[in-house]
Structure formats: C-alpha cells, structure tokens
Design a protein with these regions (language model features):
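Negatively charged, low-complexity tracts enriched in Asp/Glu with abundant Ser/Thr
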Residues: 1-40
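Ampiphathic alpha-helical segments that act as solvent-exposed interaction surfaces
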Residues: 20-24, 70-97
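Short, intrinsically disordered low-complexity segments
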Residues: 38-62
C-alpha cells in the first residue's frame, strides 16, 4: 500500500472522516467494495470509476486518515481522485467566513 493524498478538509477528526466515507458511498463516481470495522480503525475500500482503480480510505482512531492503494496510480489519476474527494468534502464541511 502507498499513500495517495491527505484530505485536509476532513483532517484527522474521526467523525469528519466517517461522515466523508459515508457520503462517498452514495457518490456517483465511487463504488464501495468492502467495509471493515476494527477497534482501532474503520476501513472503507472503494473503486474510483473514472480511472477504474481501487483505493482505501482508512479512518484510524489513533493516526488519523489514510488514503492509500495497493495499485500504481499516475499523478493525473491521483489528482482526479483528490479533486473528486475534495469537491465532496468542501460541500460537506463548508463553514461561514
């Protein structure tokens, strides 16, 4: 596994990470492949449809969020995934001012 990017809008807040993972499950560009619940983390495995590759969104209750994949992602593919996740996070976590 290698890290792809860090979603700053979700940060390492477990509630925000879990909320983002829940919204990704219903987003049209994402397909939930697997969900694993462990005492130290909740792990959500998704396929990102525009590039047809899987990634893992881990909400680690000790270390924070980890967005990673066992597959090779090009810089352009990673940027597309990051932009899609950030668009969703921006809508969720908009704050005034």
């Amino acid at each position: 596994m290698h890290d792809l990017f860090y979603c700053k809008l979700a940060g390492d807040d477990a509630e925000r990470c879990l909320a983002l993972a829940a919204v990704l499950q219903n987003a049209p560009d994402f397909v939930l492949l697997e969900q694993v619940f462990a005492p130290e983390a909740d792990i959500f495995c998704f396929a990102f449809l525009p590039v047809q590759k899987p990634f893992r969104f881990k909400c680690d209750f000790v270390y924070g969020q980890i967005i990673s994949s066992g597959e090779h992602w090009t810089a352009a593919e990673t940027a597309a995934l990051e932009a899609a996740v950030n668009r969703i996070a921006e809508k969720m976590f908009q704050t005034a001012g």
